[in-house]
Swiss-Prot record:
It comes from Methanococcus maripaludis (strain C5 / ATCC BAA-1333). A zinc finger (C4-type) spans 41-62. This is Large ribosomal subunit protein eL43. The gene is rpl37ae. Binds 1 zinc ion per subunit. It holds the Pfam family Ribosomal_L37ae.
Length: 96
């Protein structure tokens, strides 16, 4: 019989067994799921953006390097700023 280092509910954090507490293991699982998820490259729109290091994301197709969040290529705050900039640009283009 093969023993697995993860469980159905906790996923990859099952490797820690009963150590460190449930909340921490659940948070770790959520972070690891976000890290491993496939993201689209903002340059070529190909879904092969991978995490190379802390806040460094590299496209496997075009080789573009992007600075983003630690666990996702774009943070929540980054999305808010991008929307605000887009609104300002649109309002200026309407005035002209």
């Amino acid at each position: 019989m093969v023993e697995f280092s993860h469980t159905k509910k906790i996923g990859s954090a099952g490797r820690f067994g009963s150590r460190y507490g449930r909340k921490i293991r659940v948070r770790l699982r959520d972070v690891e799921i976000k890290q491993k998820k496939e993201y689209k490259c903002p340059v070529c729109a190909f879904p092969k953006l991978k995490r190379a290091g802390t806040s460094i994301w590299v496209c496997e197709k075009c080789g573009a390097k992007i600075a983003g969040g630690a666990y996702t290529p774009e943070t929540g705050a980054g999305k808010v700023v991008t929307k605000a900039i887009r609104r300002v640009i649109e309002s200026k283009s309407r005035e002209i």
